[in-house]
Design a protein with these regions (language model features):
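Metal-dependent phosphoester-hydrolase catalytic domains
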Residues: 45-51, 61-181
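Beta-strand-turn-beta hairpins that frame and shape the catalytic cleft
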Residues: 1-20, 180-181
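Beta-sheet entry/capping signal
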Residues: 8-10, 52-54, 173
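A compositional/structural signature marking long, glycine- and acidic/polar-rich segments
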Residues: 16, 26, 38-42
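Second-shell loop/turn segments in exported
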Residues: 20-30, 55-56, 99-102, 162-163
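Active-site metal-binding loops of divalent metal-dependent hydrolases
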Residues: 16, 58-59
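His/acidic metal-ligating clusters that form di-metal
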Residues: 33-56
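Alpha-helical membrane segments in multi-pass integral membrane proteins
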Residues: 8-9, 30-33
Length: 181
């Protein structure tokens, strides 16, 4: 938490419980974290209604999963739909078949996300999200490479329990732009 040009900014970095044991079985753990985070957000928004809030990190759920949509109340549209408190600018990136920040069993997921409070989307605030600036950083050096089906996947630092000298992570990083008005 801090201020930028007198506007309050709260950054909340997340790493939610994994899907170990299966998505359905593990979902209650992520919903519980979403509820705890929701209480923190509600408290901040009550005391600072115009605060800019960025929730970011590895949510271990995709943009359309229950923990994000119902737990955090993050939607894909702006202006925000009724009942939503955050915009998820990552949502359109997940609509592309070969896009995501990680793969599991050959399927792309977008667990690494930014969720933005309404105040970051309004033009009158000092700090503003630059529309359509979110992206997944996927340089070739971070990809498996080659000709096989895994060529576009992240080059892991640890694979099957062994350190890979040329590896990076099992997730690609994400970024976005903010501007000061």
């Amino acid at each position: 938490s801090g201020k930028i040009k007198k506007q309050s900014l709260h950054l909340v970095v997340n790493h939610w419980p994994s899907r170990y044991g299966g998505m359905e079985k593990s979902e209650p753990r992520r919903m519980a974290v979403a509820e705890q985070l929701r209480a923190i957000i509600d408290s901040v928004q009550q005391s600072e209604p115009n605060a800019a809030i960025i929730l970011m990190g590895d949510f271990n759920d995709d943009p359309f999963n229950r923990s994000i949509v119902e737990g955090i109340k993050a939607g894909k549209n702006w202006p925000l739909e009724e009942g939503m408190n955050f915009n998820n600018p990552m949502y359109p990136l997940h609509q592309v078949d070969s896009s995501g920040t990680l793969t599991y069993r050959g399927k792309w997921n977008l667990f690494d996300q930014f969720l933005l409070s309404d105040d970051l989307l309004k033009g009158e605030n000092k700090l503003q999200y630059v529309a359509n600036s979110v992206a997944i950083h996927r340089p070739e050096m971070m990809q498996v490479g080659g000709d096989g089906p895994a060529k576009d996947m992240p080059r892991r630092a640890i694979y099957r329990g062994e350190f890979q000298e040329r590896g990076f992570s099992d997730h690609f990083p994400v970024f976005m732009e903010l501007k000061l008005n």
